[in-house]
Amino acid sequence: MFEDKRERPRTLHELCEALNVSMHNIQVVCVYCKKELCRADVYNVAFTEIKIVYRDNNPYAVCKQCLLFYSKIREYRRYSRSVYGTTLEAITKKSLYDLSIRCHRCQRPLGPEEKQKLVDEKKRFHEIAGRWTGQCANCWQRTRQRNETQV
């Protein structure tokens, strides 16, 4: 489909433009389970800014179930260290707001408010596979609810 590697769309929005299809009608297959993504998964790929990958010149994305599963596997296999926000700024010599940090669970990019909340709550940032991660507000809320109901 896309033989020239330089012209391959890297995001779902770019893929929709290249195929002249709306995001509501695009059909993409999961790179892991090979099932077609449902609408919610397609919107999740767009919202989390996950890159499109290619196998045999065909575009693939990732479904939510595989994303969560392989994010956990990646965390177990490739975890390096955890540091507080001030330490991370000292290590990288950059402000947290200038760093690209994703949620280690759902891979969504963290916004400035989420980064600040992690600092305020004295939560750590994690280096996994050479990239810095934290926890987004959505995943944080889920863990809090799960922990509070287990009492």
UniProtKB/Swiss-Prot annotation:
Transmembrane segments: none annotated. Its main location: host cell. A motif (PDZ-binding domain) lies at residues 149-151. It is found in: Host cytoplasm; Host nucleus. InterPro entries: E6, E6_sf. Belongs to the high risk human alphapapillomavirus family. The cancer-causing human papillomavirus E6 protein has a unique carboxy terminal PDZ domain containing substrate. Forms homodimers. Interacts with ubiquitin-protein ligase UBE3A/E6-AP and thus forms a complex with human TP53. Interacts with human NFX1 and MAGI3. Interacts with human IRF3; this interaction inhibits the establishment of antiviral state. Interacts with human TYK2; this interaction inhibits JAK-STAT activation by interferon alpha. Interacts with host DLG1; this interaction leads to the proteasomal degradation of DLG1. This is Protein E6. The lineage of its organism: Viruses, Monodnaviria, Shotokuvirae, Cossaviricota, Papovaviricetes.
